[in-house]
């Protein structure tokens, strides 16, 4: 056994291909065949001696060296193997998943061994002081008679349960009778009652000492219990919350410790639909992408937004499969169970919008091949046609063949208790990014205290509104644009009323139109022809206008405040819709706090231009209605220059909201949608530690944010400051913003609980 494991772990004697079996197992199988036995345990001592000789010969053949006989050589070989393991593929992947810095390195423990394989009076196992899946205060674990610890961990043999209760539960799941269980699969409490009682007592003692759930490894050598190690056990999000609250109620830890025990990201697990665990074990993985938006989704494949809508109207569940998404796909995304994209990263359009909707999304699945013309997608060696069933796991990035049943997670009182604790200790408010009353209500249910970003452009794609938007874009003069905008005014006003009502007195930051106009016009000839017929103009005129709107670099082009400056009637319409909606809701007895945000400002002149239009429009509405309400005018800080001249911009702006998605793009010079092509390589080769679109780059982008806050407040000490990029829901970024003294962070609705806990932790750690 020693030669086999040393040869594998230290000398690297592993199968060379996936089809090849372990070289040592091949030798064992041959010897068993020669001896006419089925199980390893049936081999005699002489047979094992023969195996040792054969193993050593294999080592010499594979490595060209004799197996080391010196204990010191063996020890140093083992130590070096542990150090080398830091850079193996699995370790690198684990670090990437858990954001562990590569430079940390690993440690080596050297300790004397005890043996669990000295006969039927010896055993080995793993135990937990509480249930790591549910958090229940139930001691549990598994053991093997006459075995070593690796056998339990590696699953070489099927282990038995430590407690009688656990053993009976396991037998019930396996369909095994109580009589058969007791005879063939007894618990440790039944087979070695003295050692089991001692183990349970030690587990309680260790938990009392560490004040947390313990994961323990033990060996029983010839009837004597030896504890090998203990550590705070890994647990699910649900178990994390329950264990912390149970320990708090028991007086073992205080409120601050309970909050600090939270891993904010794990709260995600509690909020989205999940797959049935038993069904998941049988599911076939056909592709893997980025876990862009958590949750579980099952549906029929569709490739276009209008098809998704049509199928959904017939009560069909669909998964929208796209090469990449654009705002025009919003309708389809809204009705889909989940979204799968071939391109795009964790902060791509699909990912950001899906998180905002609480939709499951797998993005950047680069190995799939989408053919829009044939309406097929190739995954895992199979071609899926429109209507075929697939399932997505937005928490892992896995794509499954067929239907995998999902279940709704149950939020219990412990979740609410943790949220109440977060509210008690936090100094930084958490708002939400929400574009519809439904999103706003969902975020309020999670404890959001306002809206930090309401994107008005998403409203333009609903129903017949897109027609009015396109009329406005294609209009040949100001009067034509105003006529089209007049159709949009009541629609926008209605949207804003719904959002103000849902927020019920909390602040609402509404961003004026941001994307370039070419995103709103049709690019397919058939759709262009329909638009031309509706407007009474020629197809050539439509094509000419669409072509004129095309830009080489739209991200840095005619968008944001630049649109409002060149087409002031757009800003006028949106400002009027906001103010009229606020007055209407105020009339119903609801307190309203509108904050009008001008996007992409980079200079004082730009914000002066737009603020003048907003203030003039508001004054007109107040005069028309004979009443007024307070409102704020501010800007998004997303252009690096805005941070550099924040002291000037604050002369006009009454609040700053840092749009860190675009600020990161412009500071790094990375395209958010194209960067995934090389960022993975950058991370693997140590160029960057984390994806700057997922975790705020505090050394670079963060310095611009800090500069913007300080300069802005130097001009206007009462300047309200927040962040509304996707970083607003990432724990380390939230803590950074809290340290800068920001008033709030804003994130998608399903990230609100994560941000609330992270903000509370920042206040406690301060």
Where are the predicted features?
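Nucleotide/phosphate-binding sheet-loop regions of phosphoryl- and nucleotidyl-transfer enzymes
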Residues: 1-283, 310, 316-319, 326-331, ...
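Long, charged amphipathic helices and adjacent flexible linkers at domain junctions
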Residues: 97, 259-311, 316-318, 324, ...
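Structural motif
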Residues: 109, 302, 319-321, 340, ...
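Glycine-rich phosphate/ribose-binding loops and adjacent secondary-structure elements
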Residues: 224-226, 319, 323-334, 338-340, ...
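General secondary-structure propensity
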Residues: 338-341, 429-431
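Conserved alpha/beta-domain cores
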Residues: 411-413, 421-766
């Amino acid at each position: 056994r020693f030669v086999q494991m040393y040869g594998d772990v230290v000398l690297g004697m592993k199968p060379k291909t996936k089809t090849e079996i372990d070289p040592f197992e091949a030798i064992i199988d041959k010897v068993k065949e020669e001896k006419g036995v089925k199980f390893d345990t049936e081999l005699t001592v002489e047979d094992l001696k023969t195996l040792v000789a054969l193993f050593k010969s294999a080592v010499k053949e594979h490595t060209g060296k004799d197996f080391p006989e010196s204990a010191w050589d063996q020890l140093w070989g083992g130590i070096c193997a542990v150090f080398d393991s830091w850079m193996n593929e699995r370790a690198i992947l684990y670090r990437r998943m858990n954001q562990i810095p590569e430079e940390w390195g690993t440690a080596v423990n050297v300790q004397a061994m005890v043996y669990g394989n000295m006969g039927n009076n010896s055993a080995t196992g793993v135990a937990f002081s509480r249930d790591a899946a549910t958090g229940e205060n139930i001691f549990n674990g598994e053991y093997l008679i006459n075995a070593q610890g690796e056998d339990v961990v590696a699953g070489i043999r099927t282990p038995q349960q430590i407690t009688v209760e656990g053993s009976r539960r396991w037998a019930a799941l396996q369909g095994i009778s109580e009589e058969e269980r007791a005879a063939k699969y007894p618990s440790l409490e039944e087979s070695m009652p003295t050692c089991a009682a001692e183990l349970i007592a030690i587990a309680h003692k260790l938990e009392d000492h560490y004040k947390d759930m313990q994961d323990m490894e033990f060996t029983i050598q010839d009837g004597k219990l030896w504890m090998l190690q203990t550590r705070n056990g890994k647990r699910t999000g649900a178990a994390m919350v329950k264990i912390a609250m149970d320990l708090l109620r028991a007086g073992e830890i205080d409120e601050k410790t309970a909050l600090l025990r939270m891993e904010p990201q794990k709260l995600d697990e509690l909020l989205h639909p999940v797959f049935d665990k038993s069904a998941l074990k049988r599911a076939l993985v056909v592709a893997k992408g980025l876990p862009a938006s958590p949750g579980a989704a099952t549906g029929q494949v569709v490739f276009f937004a209008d098809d998704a809508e049509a199928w959904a109207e017939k009560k069909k569940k669909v998964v929208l499969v796209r090469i990449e998404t654009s705002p025009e796909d919003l309708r389809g995304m809204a009705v889909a169970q989940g979204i799968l994209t071939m391109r795009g990263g964790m902060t791509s359009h699909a990912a950001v919008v899906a998180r905002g909707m609480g939709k499951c999304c797998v993005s950047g699945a680069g190995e799939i091949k989408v053919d829009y013309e044939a309406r097929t997608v190739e995954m895992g060696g199979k071609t899926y046609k429109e209507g075929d069933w697939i399932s997505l796991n937005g928490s892992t990035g896995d794509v499954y063949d067929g239907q995998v049943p999902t279940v709704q997670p149950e939020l219990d009182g412990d979740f609410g208790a943790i949220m109440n604790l977060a509210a008690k200790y936090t100094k930084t408010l958490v708002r939400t990014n929400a574009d519809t009353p439904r999103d706003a209500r969902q975020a309020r249910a999670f404890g959001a205290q306002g809206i930090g970003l309401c994107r008005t452009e998403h409203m333009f794609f609903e129903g017949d509104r897109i027609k009015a938007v396109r009329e406005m874009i294609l209009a040949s003069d100001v009067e034509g644009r105003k006529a089209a905008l007049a159709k949009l005014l009541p629609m926008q006003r209605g949207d804003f009323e719904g959002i103000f009502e849902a927020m019920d007195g909390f602040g609402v930051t509404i961003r004026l139109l941001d994307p370039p106009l070419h995103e709103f016009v049709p690019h397919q000839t058939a759709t262009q022809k329909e638009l031309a017929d509706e407007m009474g103009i020629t197809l050539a005129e439509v094509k000419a206008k669409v072509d004129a709107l095309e830009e080489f670099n739209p991200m840095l082009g005619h968008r944001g405040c630049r649109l409002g400056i060149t087409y002031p009637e757009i800003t006028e319409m949106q400002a009027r819709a906001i103010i009229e909606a606020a007055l209407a809701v105020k009339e119903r007895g609801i307190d309203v706090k509108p904050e009008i945000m001008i996007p992409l400002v980079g200079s004082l002149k730009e914000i002066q231009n737009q603020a003048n239009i907003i203030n003039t429009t508001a004054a007109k509405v107040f005069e028309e209605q004979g009443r007024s309400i307070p409102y704020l005018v501010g800007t998004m800080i997303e252009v690096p220059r805005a941070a550099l001249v924040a002291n000037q911009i604050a002369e006009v702006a009454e609040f700053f909201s840092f749009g860190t998605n675009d600020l990161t793009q412009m500071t790094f010079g990375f395209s958010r949608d194209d960067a995934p092509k090389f960022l993975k390589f950058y991370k693997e080769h140590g160029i960057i530690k984390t994806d700057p679109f997922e975790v705020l780059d505090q050394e670079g982008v963060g310095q611009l944010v800090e500069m913007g806050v300080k300069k802005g407040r130097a001009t206007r000490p009462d300047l309200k400051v927040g962040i509304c990029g996707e970083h607003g829901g990432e724990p380390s970024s939230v803590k950074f913003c809290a340290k800068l003294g920001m008033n709030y962070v804003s994130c998608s609705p399903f990230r609100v609980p994560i941000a609330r806990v992270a903000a509370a932790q920042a206040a406690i750690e301060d």
